[in-house]
Design a protein with these regions (language model features):
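A recurrent domain-boundary module in secreted/ectodomain proteins
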Residues: 237-277
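Structural recognition of the beta-strand scaffold that forms the well-ordered cores
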Residues: 22-27, 119-125, 151-155, 179, ...
């Protein structure tokens, strides 16, 4: 019995209890990573709870009176299905890619069979990152032939300035870590679409965000960011104007309220690539 085979730990994606369109959560370690058992000690489950609680609170009395929830992959007992995976590459080979590290993680987990076309993958990566605390693939910016279905939280993250600082870490509250995680999950679900009226694309100014889109320049929004990528603006809103990415009236533009990956789900739901241009 390998040391990582512990009671309650899953090494596979368990059979779905829904239609298979869901956000599958994974605790992923590099080859040389230390197992902190975040999948077993409720740390990851608590993070997902805080994310979903905040999302639901910001969607109440909008498209649905009781709001919506993120459609996480769950088990028969309604607990989140979390898969443990140790990769075959070392931390340095991932961390050095900075904000683009998620583009290393996606094909890495795919090699182990985590490539269900119905699923979006959210990775809690137990290692470092040269530049950022979290990052995501952007479906509307993906080039042909590239799979863009993965978002990642790097924990503890940055080698210079840990991601658990500035009111971060696994805590029973919607803090900086939870905000970063939800921000990236919304990215991989398609927010902010390029067709949104306030969609922001960063200029080429020699920063890690050069040329990256999918944001808003509206302080307080969960999708707000700045060119330098360094902001501790408190997230207060989820498209409070209902004009960019949630419950808006632009019928040809992606709307998270109509996503396949939220519940309740509308009758004709959208995938993250809906009207990507």
């Amino acid at each position: 019995m390998f040391s990582e085979e512990k009671p309650g730990r899953n090494f596979t994606d368990l059979p779905d209890v829904d239609d298979g369109y869901n956000i599958h959560v994974m605790y992923v370690l590099p080859k040389d990573g230390v197992d902190k058992e975040y999948d077993l000690d409720s740390k990851i489950s608590m993070l997902m709870y805080q994310i979903d609680k905040w999302f639901n609170s910001k969607t109440k009395d909008r498209l649905f009176a009781d709001g919506q929830n993120l459609k996480f992959d769950r088990k028969d007992d309604n607990k989140i299905d979390i898969t443990f995976l140790r990769l075959d590459i070392n931390d340095d080979e991932i961390s050095k890619h900075g904000i683009q590290a998620v583009n290393v993680l996606q094909p890495a987990i795919s090699r182990f069979g985590f490539n269900d076309p119905k699923k979006v993958y959210f990775i809690i990566y137990g290692g470092s990152n040269r530049d950022v605390c979290a990052s995501s693939q952007l479906p509307s910016y993906a080039t042909e032939g590239v799979t863009a279905n993965t978002a990642a939280l790097y924990y503890p993250g940055k080698r210079s300035g840990s991601c658990i600082e500035n009111n971060g870490g696994f805590k029973p509250e919607f803090n900086e870590t939870a905000k970063a995680a939800l921000h990236e999950i919304l990215h991989v679900l398609g927010a902010v679409p390029q067709c949104a009226e306030d969609h922001l694309v960063f200029k080429d100014e020699g920063t890690i965000n050069d040329g990256i889109g999918g944001h808003l320049s509206i302080p307080g929004d969960i999708m707000y960011s700045v060119q330098s990528n360094k902001t501790y603006d408190k997230a207060k809103h989820l498209d409070f104007k209902s004009s960019n990415y949630y419950n808006h009236n632009n019928e040809n533009c992606l709307d998270i309220a109509k996503s396949r990956y939220v519940i309740p789900t509308v009758s004709n739901p959208q995938l993250p690539t809906f009207s990507s241009k």
